[in-house]
């Protein structure tokens, strides 16, 4: 299963293809997962995708799903995992490298040391509450909300009462040929 419209548009496939060329000879099921917040529409989409996956399982075939990062962190895989497990199929999670760990390695920085806290925040939602968190704040999956996130961060840095030293980094497509690295709010904007 590729969570994309086509194998050409699937980053995970393009990465695996480089180290495992025989994947090109395998049956591929391209199933784009919608990135929407409407719970009812999302559930219907997941059911439709899982039904297609289960058709293969009923034929006695083994099914795998490629994702970027770790399947346990904001991953489309977990929806399929739960559906398969609930239906009585064996479902296994193979850990990957979380994107924020890859980013920290790429930047040569530590996410947390000694008693420092690390917070992972889904940036597609309201992030204001997270401004009070101490330690490292990792905003993931900002997508269409990036401008809003940057505005909130800029306002927080201008507020004299809450101003503390903050290093702000951003990376898109970490480790890929189209990787972009940003240091500071000015570069991100």
Model-derived segments and their meaning:
Residues 1-89:
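Class I S-adenosyl-L-methionine
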Residues 2-5, 15, 131-189:
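A contiguous loop/helix-start segment that scaffolds small-molecule binding in enzyme catalytic cores
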Residues 46-55, 110-122, 187-189:
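A polyampholytic, Gly/Pro-enriched intrinsically disordered region
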Residues 60-66, 117, 136-138, 167:
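Residue-level preference for the first positions of well-ordered beta-strands
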Residues 72-133:
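Class I SAM-dependent methyltransferase SAM-binding "motif I" and its flanking Rossmann-like core
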Residues 7-9, 36, 98-101, 176-178:
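Short gly/pro/ser/thr-enriched loop/turn and capping motifs at secondary-structure boundaries
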Residues 25-30, 91, 120, 168-170:
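Conserved beta-strand scaffold positions in the cores of enzyme catalytic domains, especially
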């Amino acid at each position: 299963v590729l969570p994309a419209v086509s194998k050409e548009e699937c980053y995970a496939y393009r990465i695996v293809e480089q180290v495992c060329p025989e994947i090109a000879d395998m049956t591929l099921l391209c199933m784009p997962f919608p990135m929407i917040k409407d719970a009812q529409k999302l559930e219907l989409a997941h059911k439709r995708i899982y039904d297609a996956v289960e058709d293969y399982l009923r034929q006695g075939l083994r099914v795998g799903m490629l994702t970027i990062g770790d399947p346990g962190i904001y991953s489309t895989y977990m929806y399929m995992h739960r559906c398969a497990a609930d239906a009585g199929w064996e479902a296994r999670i193979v850990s990957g490298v979380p994107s924020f760990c890859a980013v920290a390695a790429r930047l040569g920085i530590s996410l947390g040391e000694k008693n420092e806290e690390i917070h992972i925040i889904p940036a597609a939602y309201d992030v204001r509450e997270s401004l009070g968190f101490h330690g490292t704040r990792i905003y993931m999956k900002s997508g269409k909300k990036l401008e809003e996130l940057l505005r909130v961060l800029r306002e927080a840095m201008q507020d004299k009462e809450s101003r503390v030293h903050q290093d702000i980094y951003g990376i898109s497509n970490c480790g890929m040929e189209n990787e972009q690295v940003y240091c500071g709010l000015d570069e991100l904007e």
